[in-house]
């Protein structure tokens, strides 16, 4: 039975954008999610995909990894560097741990393997909407300054002292915010899994280690001897630097 149409409560339909070169799969997803009160756009290639992203508001993205001549992971990477929209990966075969780590590192938030049940797929869409990063919803105006860096939450931009921008995936961005909100507090891997907004049952502790390594490579002069993100052996990680917070350009007291 379909859920109540949000339009009856004066709310717009949530928009799901799907990229899959399988015509039958596109039709199935569009038909099923439409019945359950979603707006669905299904496309076959990255050109159409980017056109929709540029012209419409999208709440969840579903990317098939097996796109023939195109690389689904590259689409995930590109999207995650410029948007916090949740990304669900679908694959024709069950992903190995290493593939999941790579996908998480690039910015995916969930996985589902073909063939999958439509009810499970619907549930994952709804979960993705619930855990969408709050930064986008609240338009957080905070900026964090630390060491030689500034992180602007509203614009999702990490800027060096020289003024150059360093791109962050959604997972890297969320982890960095978690550290900056609690400088020098030890955060466990479980806390970091929650902060990165990925499903715990779909990942392994090592995926957090990979994200940490990526952040160190972007922030640290020598990532092998980190000065900012340090390891608390057996406990997790902590951010070892003073952090200043400003709100819309006004420094917090």
UniProtKB/Swiss-Prot annotation:
GO MF term list: phosphorelay response regulator activity; transcription cis-regulatory region binding
Main localization category: cytoplasm
Subcellular location: Cytoplasm
Pfam families: Response_reg (PF00072), Trans_reg_C (PF00486)
Modified residues (4-aspartylphosphate): 64
Modification(s) after translation: Phosphorylated by wide host range (WHR) VirA protein.
DNA-binding region per UniProt: 141-241
Domain Response regulatory: 15-129
Alphabetized SUPFAM superfamilies for the sequence: C-terminal effector domain of the bipartite response regulators, CheY-like
GO cellular component assignments: cytosol; protein-DNA complex
Alphabetically ordered keywords of this record: Activator, Crown gall tumor, Cytoplasm, DNA-binding, Phosphoprotein, Plasmid, Transcription, Transcription regulation, Two-component regulatory system
GO terms under biological process: regulation of DNA-templated transcription
Function: VirG is required for the positive regulation of at least two vir loci encoded by the Ti plasmid of A.tumefaciens.
Name of the protein described by the UniProt record: Regulatory protein VirG
Protein species of origin: Agrobacterium fabrum (strain C58 / ATCC 33970)
């Amino acid at each position: 039975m379909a859920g109540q149409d949000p339009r009856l409560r004066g709310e717009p339909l949530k928009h799901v954008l799907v990229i899959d070169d399988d015509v039958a799969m596109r039709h199935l997803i569009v038909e099923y999610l439409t019945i359950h009160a979603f707006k669905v756009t299904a496309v076959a290639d990255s050109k159409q995909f980017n056109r929709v992203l540029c012209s419409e508001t999208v709440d969840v993205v579903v990317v098939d990894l097996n796109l023939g001549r195109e690389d689904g992971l590259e689409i995930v990477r590109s999207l995650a560097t410029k948007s916090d929209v949740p990304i669900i990966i679908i694959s024709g075969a069950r992903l190995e741990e290493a593939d999941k780590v790579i996908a998480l590192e690039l910015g995916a938030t969930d996985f589902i393997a073909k063939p999958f049940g439509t009810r499970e797929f619907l549930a994952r869409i709804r979960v993705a909407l619930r855990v969408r990063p709050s930064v986008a919803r609240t338009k957080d105006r905070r900026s964090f300054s630390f060491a030689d860096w500034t992180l602007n939450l509203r614009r999702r931009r990490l800027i060096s002292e020289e003024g150059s921008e360093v791109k962050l995936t959604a997972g890297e961005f969320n982890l960095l915010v978690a550290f900056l909100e609690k400088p020098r507090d030890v955060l466990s891997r479980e806390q970091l899994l929650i902060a990165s907004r990925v499903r715990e049952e779909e990942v392994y502790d090592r995926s957090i280690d990979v994200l940490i390594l990526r952040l160190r490579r972007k922030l640290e002069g020598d990532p092998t001897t980190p000065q900012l993100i340090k390891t608390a052996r057996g406990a997790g990680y902590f951010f070892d630097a003073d952090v200043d917070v400003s709100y819309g350009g006004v420094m917090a007291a």
